Structure formats: C-alpha cells, structure tokens
Amino acid sequence: MSLSLPPLIAVACLVVALARISWLPLRSWLRRRRRTHQLAAQLPGPRNLPLLGNFHMFFGLEPWQVPHLINQLAKKYDGTFKLKMGSNFSLMMFQPRDIEVVLGSSQLLDKAVEYSFLRGWLNDGLLLSGGRKWHRRRKIITPAFHFRILESYDEIFDRQTRLLIHKWQQTLGHSFDLGHDVHLFTLDVICETAMGVSTNAQTNADSDYVRAVKTISTVLHKRMFNIFYRFDLTYMLTPLAWAERRALNVLHKFTEKIIVQRREELLRGGVTQTTDGADVGAKSKMVFLDILLQSNIDDKPLTNLDIREEVDTFMFEGHDTTSSGITFFFYNIALYPECQRKCVEEIVSVLGKDTETPVTYDLLNNLNYMDLCIKETLRMYPSVPLLGRKVLQECEINGKIIPAGTNIGISPLFLGRSEDISSEPNTFKPERFDVVTSAEKLNPHAYIPFSAGPRNCIGQKFAMLEIKAIAANVLRHYEIEFVGNAEESPVLIAELILRTKDPLMFKLKKRVI
C-alpha cells in the first residue's frame, strides 16, 4: 500500500527540518574550527601533520627526553610556540611578560586539558573547579591556611619527622633511596593535617591506602606520556583503567569514612554552627576537615561529596609536591657542603644544640638562610614543572590573538633554568634570593614555583613550613651525602610532579654538634 501525497510531503518536510537542525550546529562548529586554524596559523611553531598534529615529534621519546625537546623548541621560537596535539592546540609561553598576563587574568582561570586525568580522584575540588564554584570554594578554604591554624600543625611536623629520623638510624653508612621515605613521611603528614588521622605510611608502606596512592601516581605518569592512554575511549578498555577504578574505590571510601566519623564526633560535641570562614583563624587544633565541616556556602553546609573533593585535593597537592621539594632540597645541600654547613649553623643558633628541642612555628620562621636554600631549590627543581590554562574565549596577549579552546602551557622549570632570566641558572646559589645583599633582581613572573595571580597555590606557606621542619630536624641529626656523580645533573621527568628518571641515592652520617 503506497503512501498518499500529503504523508510523503510531511515526511519530506520532517527530513528537511531535521537536516537544517543538524546543519546549524555543524556549521557553527565548522566556523569556529576555521577561525581557530586561521589564528593558530599566525602563531610560531613546528609544522604539524594531518590528524596527528605534532604527536609524531614525541613518538619514540622516553619521558625524560621530553623536557630536552621542549627546551629546544623554546630556544628556536624565542620562548613562544604552538603544538597541535590531535585536534587541540597548545601554546607554550616562556616569556615573563606573557606569563604575567596569563596568570594575572581573571578570564584565564580554567585548567588545561591534562588536569582532567585527575578528575576521577579529585572531581570538582579546588584544583579542577572553575567559575563561580572555584571562587566560592577558594573563599571558604583560604582561612584554613591562616597562621594560627598553621601554628597548630608544628607538633605534627615535629612528631612525624622524628619518626623518620629514628627510621633512618638503620640506614647509617648505607646508600638508600631517600625520596621514597620522604614520600611516605609527607603522606602521613598530609593525612593527619587534612583529616586528623594517620595512614601510618612510614611504618606500613604496604597498606591499601598507600598502594592506592601509588597506583594513581602510576596512572598519571602513563596517561601523560602514552598516547594510547590519553584518550578516554581507548584508556577505559585497558587493565590500567581497571586498576585506577579499584584504587579510587579505596581512596574515596577511606576519605568518606573519616568524613562521616568526624561529622558525628562534632555533632556529639555540640559543634553544629557553621561559619563562612571569618573566624577560623581564631581557632586552634583544627584539621582541614574540621574547617570544611563547619563551613557553608549560601547558608548551606557542604555536603560529604563537597568535602571529599577538597580533602582529596589537599591530599594530592600536599604530599607529592612537598615530597619532591624536600628530596631536591636534600640533593642540593648534599652537593654543596658549604650551604649545608651554613644551614646547620643557623639551626643551632635558632634551636640550640639540644636535638630534643621541638621545632615550632615561630622558630621555623627564623631560619632565614634555610628559606633562601629552599627558594633556590624550587627555582631549579619546581615541584610542579608545568602549569596549564584553558582559553575559553578568544583573547589577546601582548599582540598575539589566542583562539578559544587553546591550552596555554607555562613552565616554572624552564623559566628557572633560563640564562636570560638568571645568572648561572644551573648553579645552586641561595644568596640570589637575599633581597638585602643580592645584586640579582629576580622577575616575580619568572619565579613561580607556586604559580601566581588569583589561582596561585593556596598551600604554599604550609609547604614551606613542612620543608623547613623536616630539614631542620634531619640536619641537626645527620650529615647528608649524595651517592652518585655530582658532575652530572639528574635526568628529569616533567610530568604533573617533577621526578627523576632514577632515584636519588644518599648516605647519612651521625652529626656531632
């Protein structure tokens, strides 16, 4: 039975309407893509291939070879160059005047696409959130790093450091991987300051939680450098993705259990009033979780999921980054014995000769030369070697028109090693940061180990105090010696957290003060 003419016309009209509806967004997308390619063509950079973009330049490279390639491109294109990775453009910007604009802009606050690999763990925590949510969360979290709160953490720093010192008595005279132990130390510290509990990582490195954290670190490393793992469609079919899901289940359940327990404890204790954070600084002996549990947004307390996001973010940002900074600090002062000697002299002058004297917030703030050594370490070996921003709307940066959708890459690592910015950039010279005696005027937008602008690292004071605490306690107990070729710089891997290709090995000797 054939259709009559009117139904045929109706079907034809429907097909035409659907085609028009489908064509309009497609046409809009094609226009945007054309505009993106027109603007990108005006930016300097190596030639890219159809479909692959510049992926071919990275084929066959080991992770530790990538920084060398980026450094070559930065020199060739005078510090600014584009890379096309598949269908996405990235613009690397290594000029301080460009960095000042990017990091100082209130319109360039969203993170680059590489950070999405963390979303399974951190969800919409402070590191990954954007827009209004980021502004609100930043406001309520900032008081958690008030100096009165930081003061209350010095007992945790001191106790966990002494556990590490006791553990290291077994290593005296033997070569060992110091960074591995420091990683477990920072994990214990961040768990206790974030949630009020200890994972006992230093005494039980094989716990489910510690192994889950290691798994996530492996996932991040492989997704950064393996093209097969970068795309969700292919990644989700791999055994690594299954391992990640198991690890996330462990991490999330651990945090959620602590949140529920702590909320019940606060309710039993009669602490129910929420705060917008204004009076948090007047409180003491509060861990990060307590502050979140007593905070609100729009007169509503944070949900358990809200709190989990921020606690997990604090955990991620506070243990791996600090561990990297501590390890490279010990590496530098082991290579430069005179700097180690000056640090010890200052420690004795501030803390005295009694090694049982606890390190406190006030005493740590008086370790000025050590502060210079830490800053110089972070110039040479920034814990976060690459910062990324996402351009949501077309913008102009010092005459360069940047298309929407571009990822902007900024490297504290390459800035710190630039001969155009620092004299003898590969030499450890703490005095360059002495504002009184140094003739070297450092550009504030060329030294950004904690980023800069409105989205700078909220926990930088916490990190500096933790590094000082472990450095002060360890150095008054042990002399530190690097085991390896001091003439050769360590081979670096610039992923989300700066690492070395091979572990840095050290020997300890009992110090006599």
Swiss-Prot record:
Signal sequence coordinates: none
Organism this protein belongs to: Drosophila mettleri (Fruit fly)
Primary localization: endoplasmic reticulum
Enzymatic class: oxidoreductase
The entry's keywords: Endoplasmic reticulum, Heme, Iron, Membrane, Metal-binding, Microsome, Monooxygenase, Oxidoreductase
Binding site for heme: E317, C457
Gene Ontology MF, one: oxidoreductase activity, acting on paired donors, with incorporation or reduction of molecular oxygen
A Pfam family recorded for this sequence: p450
Gene Ontology CC terms, in alphabetical order: endoplasmic reticulum membrane
Entry keyword annotation includes Cytoplasm: no
Name assigned to this protein: Cytochrome P450 4d10
Organism lineage string: Eukaryota, Metazoa, Ecdysozoa, Arthropoda, Hexapoda
Induction record: By isoquinoline alkaloids and phenobarbital.
Metal-binding in keyword set: yes
Record localization: Endoplasmic reticulum membrane; Microsome membrane
